[in-house]
Amino acid sequence: MRTLKRITALALAVLLLPLHLYAAEDSVFIRIDRDDPDAWKKELANVRFLEEEGMSGSAQFSETQFGDLAAELKEESEDVWIVDCRLESHGLINGIAVSWCGEDNGANLGKTPEEVEAEEEALSSLIGTTVTAYTAENDRPKDGLELTVEKWETERTLTESEGMHYLRLACPDHCWPPSEVIDSFINFAKDLEEGAWLHFHCQAGSGRTGAFMTIYEMMQKPDASVEDILQHQADTGSGNLVERSAPEKSHAQKERCVLARAVFQYIQANYESGYEVNWSEWLETHSRTITMQIGEKLDGEGFSSDPLVVSDSLEASAAGRATVLVDNDVYFITVENY
């Protein structure tokens, strides 16, 4: 009880502190989970249903949007799982989807899923207070909406009110999911009952949602072409994991493309055993962290050439870092004197 009270006090302090008191690098605010303050009244964004694969995906939903979505999901299966891919705290104020927003949408980094969910539960203490929620532009608050909190609901509570299951895969935004979270998902997915339906979502319904939809399709199609799977996901609304070396991509975006292909290699090697070796163990034995000089060559099937040459042009958007897949090994490269 003492821990719960402490969490409640800290959460309230964060939510109610005037925005101008935050240092820019530590700024956290309540975000309405779409760019339009009235989006929660409209159609849910980035919805796609993949019938053959038994899954669907979307952006974050409001209470009203979830009611419509739940009706569709129940037509697909009696065994529906809502797979919440967000690390940042979120929930519903008066039915409106809101979340913590920090720099690079990075609120809650370092916290466990249990800690995050405990904070979300504790926010029922907001009832009766008035808060201001904002849309976000470049991770800064915009277009405030003042809300007198009459109702606070966690996503787990909302999901279970419709008779559905809830799974939290707490992943930070803008990067490939942590290895331990992928382990948890694969261990969950491999034991699903036949006919189960998974609905994935994150904030926008693209990056984190797409990563797990991609992994789930890979588990179902270990003999397919990885490029076909990645293209299928890109065509249906997931983040683009196809183009690995486009110069406009950030290091994190390029790394996601590489690690998606590495996960497919892992699945091909381990699905027949029922994934006795988990992803994080496999990656540990199939990865190398090295330092290279500009112009140095890495023999093997390279990221963009054969052999791989670490060059100014290759690393121009990666700030002296690269992640590449060479044969069956992932190389995490730091470029010296960049």
Short names for language-model regions:
Residues M1-A24:
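Gram-positive cell-envelope targeting signals
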Residues G205:
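Conserved G/P- and acidic residue-centered "switch" motifs that form tight phosphate/ATP-binding loops
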Residues T3-L4, S99, T112, A319:
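Compositionally biased, low-complexity segments enriched in small residues
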Residues R208:
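Conserved SAM/SAH-binding loop-helix junction
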Residues I290-Y338:
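Extracytoplasmic soluble-region selector
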Residues L16-H199, A211-T291:
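Cys-dependent protein tyrosine phosphatase-like superfamily
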